[in-house]
């Protein structure tokens, strides 16, 4: 019998790789005991990049969500881990050092055991400080190698980085094959090289199924010494996401490895619950093409999770490109032709930008440059004329050291713009900032929260946190959700009137008790306005006034708990007795 292989359920990344949002705290509270019941997971990825921020985006408190999810897993002896972008923390751009230090203290107190620290450029300067900060905060630092396939990403390149990270105190190494393009034999050689030199180091493999290599890669890394494999569950496994635990377990068991058994009754429960979450609201923001695999990903190297955003970008510019072509007297381009053109442009751009591993945020930078180049070429203009500031920061070395050399044309372009290259430690560009955020919280009368977790959220995601606190985030999300639901119904061939009838059929009308003018609020500071679709009202809440013809103001109360799905009478509109003012769906 070969060595024991453990499984980690990447529940957070399953959602990130499939769509825009993450489950709510109440949903995580329901799935966690079922994950425990499955009995096959030593670890679960609970939070990190694209989790806390996403909670804020739909108006929920991420700290509550993290604590809710980790507690039952901890009680069952399952280790929890989070995704950590090193210098970028939990966001897409650099974070001051004092905020990075606070992150580990907060997340440890919230029940997160392990932090998977990665830098999209594999620059150890962005990872090593986090190893130290994580240990000081009580967490286990899992240092990460971002896997890609290029002439400069050799076994020697990666083992040299691993040596430095292990020397800095990392007890674990993750091979983050975020696009699934790591070649199986190569990955096996890399694991073997690390294990031969550092047999005590735990190696965890994280791969995506997009190009179709993942199962072979898993077998290779296990045969060469890997300890833990990241897996998913239905209905979100496969496609461009992750391999399913059932298939991985069966393959490794047949190969002679010791693997845990799966409680299939619990698996089916987890599958059903996850589908319920998709049907509830998450599915409205999931791109169906993420369920498709594509060998084309091997050529461009883009992560599977990016395909949805890339297709959205392409659909957005497709009609514009065809208008340009029409003006030039040329035939219109099919969307599939445009996809191939973009893939080919990524292959052209990537080496000339120094082969940055195509992982967040650098995958977005490369994709955006390629997309802009395609647009410029269609117009008959030069490449490289539409490079944004974030991409220039990467090119100039402000995010870290690029693995490969920049093309001479890029260097010349930078010089022509008067831009300066740097090899300074990227952190030196971002001074400490917690005192500034403490002052803001004090001025607003906001609590720092348990273990300073609210202070941390403001410091990490300041704009999103302010929108969350003001209620703007919730309001915006509910509008987006209603639009997405309406669009889905419209796809089914329903007219706007039919969609309205369906929404009304599920809702209760708030009726005018008398003839008069609708006044939702009486503002003395600015214009009064109607409430937003999605706004919640409780049973005894005041809803509006009716200004009657005889000069009275009659209060209208809701009478039940629900959310607005339609405003039928706008602020200031005249209504007759019994006329619907609004429709609310009961909760």
Model-derived regions, located:
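Hydrophobic faces of well-ordered beta-strands that scaffold small-molecule active sites
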Residues: 5-13, 19, 42-46, 78-85, ...
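Active-site beta->alpha loop and helix N-cap motifs at the rims of alpha/beta catalytic domains
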Residues: 33, 48-163, 180-183
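Short histidine-centered loop motifs in beta-beta connectors
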Residues: 519-536, 560, 564-573
């Amino acid at each position: 019998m070969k060595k024991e292989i453990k499984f980690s359920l990447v529940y957070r990344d399953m959602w990130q790789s499939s769509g825009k949002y993450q489950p709510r705290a109440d949903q995580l509270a329901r799935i966690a005991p079922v994950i425990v019941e499955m009995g096959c997971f030593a670890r679960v990825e609970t939070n990190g990049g694209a989790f806390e921020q996403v909670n804020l985006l739909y108006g929920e408190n991420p700290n509550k969500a993290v604590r809710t999810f980790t507690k039952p897993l901890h009680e069952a002896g399952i280790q929890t881990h989070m995704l950590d972008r090193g210098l970028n923390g939990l966001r897409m751009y650099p974070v001051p050092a004092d905020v990075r230090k606070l992150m580990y203290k907060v997340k440890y107190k919230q029940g997160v055991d392990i932090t998977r620290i990665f830098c999209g450029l594999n620059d150890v300067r962005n990872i090593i400080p986090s190893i130290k900060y994580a240990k000081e905060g009580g967490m286990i630092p899992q240092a990460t190698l971002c896997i890609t396939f290029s002439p400069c990403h050799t076994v020697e390149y990666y083992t040299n980085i691993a040596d430095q990270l292990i020397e800095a105190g990392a007890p674990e190494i993750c091979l983050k094959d975020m696009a699934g393009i790591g070649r199986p034999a190569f990955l096996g050689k890399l694991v073997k090289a690390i294990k031969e030199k550092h047999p005590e180091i735990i190696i965890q493999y994280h791969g995506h199924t997009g190009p179709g290599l993942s199962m072979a890669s898993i077998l290779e890394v296990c045969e060469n010494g890997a300890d833990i494999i990241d897996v998913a569950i239905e209905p979100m496994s496969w496609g461009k996401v992750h391999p399913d635990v059932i298939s991985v377990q069966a393959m490794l068991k047949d190969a002679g490895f010791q693997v845990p058994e799966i409680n299939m009754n619990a698996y089916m429960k987890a599958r059903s619950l996850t589908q319920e979450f998709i049907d509830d609201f998450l599915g409205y923001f999931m791109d169906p093409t993420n369920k498709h695999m594509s060998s084309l990903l091997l050529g461009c190297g883009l992560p599977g999770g990016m395909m949805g955003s890339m297709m959205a970008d392409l659909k957005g510019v497709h009609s514009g490109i065809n208008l340009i072509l029409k003006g030039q007297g040329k035939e219109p381009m099919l969307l599939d032709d445009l996809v191939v053109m973009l893939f080919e442009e990524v292959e052209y751009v990537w080496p000339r930008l120094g082969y940055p591993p195509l992982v967040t945020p650098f995958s977005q930078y490369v994709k955006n440059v390629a997309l802009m180049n395609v647009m410029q070429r269609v117009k008959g203009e030069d490449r490289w004329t539409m490079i944004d500031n974030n991409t220039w920061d990467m090119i100039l070395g402000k995010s870290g050291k690029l693995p490969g050399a920049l093309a001479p044309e890029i260097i010349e372009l930078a010089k022509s713009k008067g831009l300066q290259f740097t090899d300074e430690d990227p952190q030196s560009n971002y001074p400490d900032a917690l005192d500034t955020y403490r002052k803001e919280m004090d001025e607003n009368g906001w609590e720092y929260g348990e273990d300073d977790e609210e202070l941390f959220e403001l410091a990490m995601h300041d704009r999103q946190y302010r929108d969350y606190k003001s209620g703007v985030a919730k309001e915006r999300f509910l509008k987006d959700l209603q639009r997405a639901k309406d669009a889905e119904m419209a796809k089914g061939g329903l007219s706007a009137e039919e969609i309205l009838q369906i929404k009304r059929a599920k809702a209760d009308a708030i009726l005018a008790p008398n003839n008069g003018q609708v006044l939702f609020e009486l503002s003395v500071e600015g214009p009064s306005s109607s409430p937003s679709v999605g706004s919640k009202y409780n049973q005894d809440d005041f809803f509006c006034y009716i200004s009657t013809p005889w000069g009275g103001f009659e209060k209208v109360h809701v009478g039940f708990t629900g959310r607005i799905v339609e405003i039928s009478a706008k602020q200031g509109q005249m209504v007759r007795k019994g006329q619907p003012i609004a429709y609310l769906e009961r909760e």
